[in-house]
Amino acid sequence: MISARRLGKRFGRKRALDRVSFDLAKDGFLLVTGANGSGKTTLLRLCAGLAAATSGELEVRARREEIGYVGHEPLVYRELTALENLTLFARLYRVPAGEARVGMLLERFGLWEERGSRAGDFSRGMLQRLALCRALLHDPELLLLDEPYNALDARGAEVLDRELKDLAGARTFVVATHDPDRVSALATARLAFA
């Protein structure tokens, strides 16, 4: 599903990625580890089509609408409620039976009781859970998760563990994390940045 050959990205004089190569088959799970500033986020942004490489080749065999992405900062509208956020994205993604899917995801991620609350009033962990719901809303083939456990409380982390285990092998994942032990058993490929 993803092939990278000598992939590079520079920001001015700073080299964010240098000659990264890997292949990830459909339904594979790539675990990306490394220190802060090592290029994990840059790699995910390139795979999501949010940035362009400055060298090398990258082939992502998924259309934009088949990709779910969760970055460092949860992409949600803080002035909208949890329900309004997901309903809006369901319309944007043209999700069939969007109402049912929205309700199911809010329930699975422990946000059903908070569905009428403004996202701006949520804790960082709740915002992360809402962003994960948004990323899963359109049932994407490829999920790109940048530090998905960041700011999750114990309940949120357990929910994410369950979701990843349920979807592993049926979806393609690229997960960048400082906590590789949580998802190590799911990985079919690994990429470690220095």
Model regions: which residues?
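Hydrophobic anchor residue at the start of the ABC signature
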Residues: L132
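Conserved ABC ATPase "signature" region
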Residues: T87, A97-E114
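Catalytic Walker B motif of ABC-type/P-loop ATPase nucleotide-binding domains
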Residues: L143-E147
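The feature captures the beta-strand-to-loop junction immediately N-terminal to the Walker
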Residues: T33-A35
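Helix-to-loop junction immediately C-terminal to a conserved catalytic motif
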Residues: A48
